[in-house]
A protein has these predicted regions:
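Conserved beta-strand elements of the Class I
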Residues: 64-66
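Short, charged amphipathic recognition helices of the HTH superfamily
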Residues: 7-21
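Conserved mixed alpha/beta core segments that line enzyme active sites in large multi-domain catalysts
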Residues: 86-91
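Single, function-defining residue in the core of a domain
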Residues: 1-9, 26, 30-31, 35-38, ...
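Short hydrophobic/aromatic segments of transmembrane alpha-helices and their interfaces
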Residues: 14, 56, 266-267
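Short Lys/Arg-enriched helix C-cap and helix-to-coil transition segments
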Residues: 41-54
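Long amphipathic N-terminal alpha/beta scaffold segment
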Residues: 55-60, 75
Length: 398
């Protein structure tokens, strides 16, 4: 449980806290030697098995809303310890830095990470990672999954992987007036609309192919489509619903989905897409509250260990919050929820089970750590780069 409960301080300070300042506590060097024997795949499997057990706690629901997105993490290393596939030479830093990319699937209802794929920065492939997570996701009996993602995930192959899983997708696409998937479809070029059509995919220019549909497109050898090999004389049909709605600033948003129109209206589609922002908030909490912006090693394999450990810590914290009964006075101006920052600290201490003779009673503590829910507040997204150089090991809070 040391990696799961580790904070942002130096490894030495974390060991002192974990072992209650015991003189016989292992040294940072000893911990690193033991970590060298541990493969990141072990912690990945622990994370997946934990999720399977947590799913049993949730009540059955007709739909599960899953947001997909990615975030990059930078760390210090040397050419001796990290291959070139992790090194970024220019751009944000004159000296260069090392980086990897986390692709994640996030449950917007339970606020937990359902799966993740970690890639070196130079082998970043969000399309491939998304398909991997969709294919291996454990489906729930009686529950349909809705995969929600921004326009960086809108591709024929991603849609097909979700359809083959017999689930639903909701992808933002480029607008109809911009070159992209929606821009090539036979759709109105202005105003709002909600239309269904069939996209027929072919991978050969042979005249033997009798393709008929609302829109027929050719996917070349340079593009990936896993359900129809290049040169095949067969076709693949994608039933798609395209929804275009106005925003407050007068612009329009275009959504591609396969959700049934009789069950999900245009307003429902709009609300579902904007709920995707939950995964952006979770990345901020994962980095700066759980402490994933402060790594404790130079080795990429150790960094992957810490990422999986922090995902475990995040999921456990959110699960404890979800099962905390919030009690407030009647007729309050706002509804209240548990403060995630306070909860993360309490749970981190609680995870150090072996070092606490009398572990804290977590639930009553969390009921005292409440903050108001102010849904009416909104803030403009920063237009500047969010890159932050990783912290040197010497510059850590005591």
């Amino acid at each position: 449980s040391f990696l799961v409960s580790q904070g942002a301080s130096s490894t030495g300070n974390e060991l002192d806290d974990f072992f209650d300042f015991h003189c016989d506590a292992p040294s940072p060097s000893a911990i690193n030697q033991q970590r060298d024997k541990l493969k990141p795949q072990v912690l990945e499997e622990v994370c997946h098995q934990l999720l399977l057990s947590l799913l049993k706690l949730d009540p059955p629901s007709p739909y599960r809303f899953l947001a997909a997105d990615g975030s990059s993490f930078s760390f210090f290393s040397t050419p001796k310890l990290a291959p070139d596939e992790y090194f970024v030479s220019g751009g944000h830093s004159a000296k260069g830095f090392y980086s990897l990319h986390l692709n994640a699937l996030y449950d917007l209802n339970s606020h937990t990470y359902m799966d993740a794929v970690i890639q070196p920065v130079h082998f970043k492939d969000e399309f491939k990672a998304f398909c991997t997570m969709v294919d291996r996701l454990e489906t729930l009996e009686g529950t349909s999954d809705i995969f929600i993602a921004d326009r960086g995930y809108c591709s024929y192959n991603n849609m097909a992987h979700v359809l083959e899983k017999k689930q639903f997708f909701l992808f933002r696409s480029k607008d109809v007036n911009v070159r992209g998937i929606a821009g090539h479809l036979p759709l109105p070029k202005q105003g709002s609309f909600d239309l269904c059509l069939d996209i027929v995919i072919k991978r050969s220019h042979s005249r033997k192919i009798a393709a008929s549909g609302d829109y027929v497109t050719f996917v070349g050898a340079a593009s990936t489509f896993d359900f129809l090999p290049y040169g095949s004389l067969d076709t693949y049909t994608l039933p798609v619903r395209v929804v275009r709605f106005p925003l407050d600033d007068g612009s329009y948003e275009c959504i591609m989905t396969n959700l049934p129109a009789d069950e999900f209206t245009m307003e429902d589609i709009k609300r579902l897409y904007f709920s995707r922002w939950g995964i952006e908030t979770s990345f901020r909490r994962l980095k700066y509250t759980i402490g994933l912006s402060s790594f404790h090693s130079y080795k990429p394999e150790f960094i992957k260990q810490e990422i999986w450990a922090k995902l475990i810590a995040y999921n456990l914290t959110e699960t404890v919050i979800n099962h905390t009964v919030v009690e407030t006075r009647k007729n309050t101006k706002h509804s209240y929820k548990v403060n995630f920052t306070e909860a993360a600290h309490i749970c981190r201490v609680f995870f150090r089970l072996h070092s606490r003779k009398n572990p804290a009673d977590v639930m009553p503590l969390l009921r005292r750590k409440l903050i108001p829910v102010r849904k009416e507040r909104s803030f403009p997204r920063l237009q500047t780069a969010h890159f932050r150089r990783p912290r040197y090991f010497l510059y850590r809070a005591a």
